[in-house]
Amino acid sequence: MAIALTHYEKKSLKLFLGIYLGSSFVLMLVISVLAFNYEKNEKIKMIRMDMDKMASKIASEVIALHMQTHGDYQNALNALISRYKDASIALFDSKKRVLYSNIPESANLIKNHKEAGFFSFRGEYYLLSDETFAHLGVAKMLFKNSKPLHFSSLYRNIVLVFVVAFLCVIGVSVFLGRLFLKPIRNEITRIDHFLKNTTHELNTPMSALVLSLKTLEDNQQHRRIKIAIQRMSFLYRSLSYLVMQDIERESFVLLDLKALIIKENTLFSEMIDYHKLEFKSDLVEVELKAKEQDFISLYSNLLMNAIKYSVMNGYIHIELTHAFLKVKNLGYEIPKDKITELSVRYVRFNSGVLGYGIGLGLVKKVCEKYKMRLEIHSEPSLKGSFYENSFCVQFQG
C-alpha cells in the first residue's frame, strides 16, 4: 500500500535523499572517472606492447640482415622496408637523417625527442627505439600507432552504466526512505490524532468558561480568575492554530489589519489593565491578502508576549504602517546573543515568566509563510534600568 507523505515527511525525505544521493553521486562519479582512466591506460599499455613487439622484431631482422650482408646494406635495407611498407614506421641514421619514413611528422618528432621511449603527440602515440645499434645504418626507429585510438565508445559505455546505476540507487533510496519513515509516521499520526481530539474536546469547556466570565463579580479574586481563563483561552487558540493548520481550508482574503488589531486589543484589554500597563496604538488603514487566522495568530502572540514580559506599570505601544507592524514594551533586557534564539519553539529568555515558548515560534512560522521578516531589538529606556523591547514584522521581507 502506498504511503501518502505529509509536508514534514516530504521535507525529511528530501533531506535524506539529498544527502544520500549527493554522496552516492560523488562516489559513483569518482569510481567512473577511475574506471575510465584505468581502461584508457590499459588500452595505451596494449598499444605500447604491440609497438614494442614490432620494434623488437624489426630490430632483430635489421641485425640479422647486417650479419648476413657483406657490404650491400642499402639493398638489404630496401628489402626490409618493402616487407613493412604498410606499417607506420620511420628509420633514421646516427645523424637523425631520414632513411625512410611514411610518417609525415617524423622529421620534427626526431628533433624534439632525443631519448628512446613511448610518447604521445597531438592525440597520437609513438615509440622511438634504438635497439638496432646502427646496424644497416639504422640508428633509430620511430613507430606510430596505425589505428587512431578513440575513447568515445568507452566514454559512452561508462556514462550509460553510470546513469543506469544511479537510477537504481535513486529507486532503492526512495524505497528505503519511505520504509524508514513509516514507523515515525505512525507515531506522529498517533500524537497528531491525540492533540486534535484533545483540542476538540477542550472547545466546549473553554467556551463555557469564557461565557461565564460575564457572571463573575468585579473583585480582585475574580479578576485573577478572569485573567487565568483569558490566558487559558489564548493558549487554547494557539494550540488550535498549531495542530489544526494542516487541515484548515480557510482561503486567502483581503484583510483589514487595523480592524483586526482593534478587535484583538479589546480581547486583551482586561489583561492589560490587570498588569497596570499603559497601552497606546498608532494604526493606519492597511490591507493584506492573507488567511485571517494566520494574522490573528501573529498579532495575538506578539501582544501576549509583550504583556507577559512587561514590567508592572510599564507600557505597550502598537504601531501599524503600510511597511511594518511593531509591538514595543517596557521590560528587561534581551541579551543580543539570545535574540536569534527567541523565535525557536520552546525557547524563552526569561524562565521566571510563565509560558511555553511557542508564541514567537508561531510568529516566525507565519512570517516565513508570507515572506515577512521579524526583527527584534532591545534598547535601554529612559525609565530607570529597564529596556524598550521592540518586535517588528516587516511586510516586505
Swiss-Prot record:
Source species: Helicobacter pylori (strain ATCC 700392 / 26695)
Superkingdom of this protein's organism: Bacteria
PROSITE patterns per UniProt: HIS_KIN
First-level EC class: transferase
GO biological process entries: phosphorelay signal transduction system
Underlying gene: crdS
Domain (Histidine kinase) ranges: 197-395
Name of this chain's protein: Sensor histidine kinase CrdS
EC number of the protein: 2.7.13.3
Function: Member of the two-component regulatory system CrdR/CrdS that induces the transcriptional induction of the copper resistance determinant CrdA in response to increasing concentrations of copper ions. Functions as a sensor protein kinase that phosphorylates CrdR. In turn, CrdR functions as a transcriptional regulator by direct binding to promoter regions of target genes including the crdA promoter or nitric oxide-responsive gene promoters.
Main localization category: membrane
Reaction(s) this enzyme catalyzes, per UniProt: ATP + protein L-histidine = ADP + protein N-phospho-L-histidine
Protein's cellular compartments: Membrane
Annotated SUPFAM superfamilies: ATPase domain of HSP90 chaperone/DNA topoisomerase II/histidine kinase (SSF55874), Homodimeric domain of signal transducing histidine kinase (SSF47384)
Membrane topology of this protein: Multi-pass membrane protein
Sequence positions bearing Phosphohistidine: 200
Entry keyword annotation includes Phosphoprotein: yes
Keyword annotations of the record: Kinase, Membrane, Phosphoprotein, Transferase, Transmembrane, Transmembrane helix, Two-component regulatory system
Membrane as UniProt keyword: yes
Gene disruption phenotype: Deletion mutant is not able to colonize the stomach in mice. It also shows a significant loss of viability upon exposure to nitric oxide.
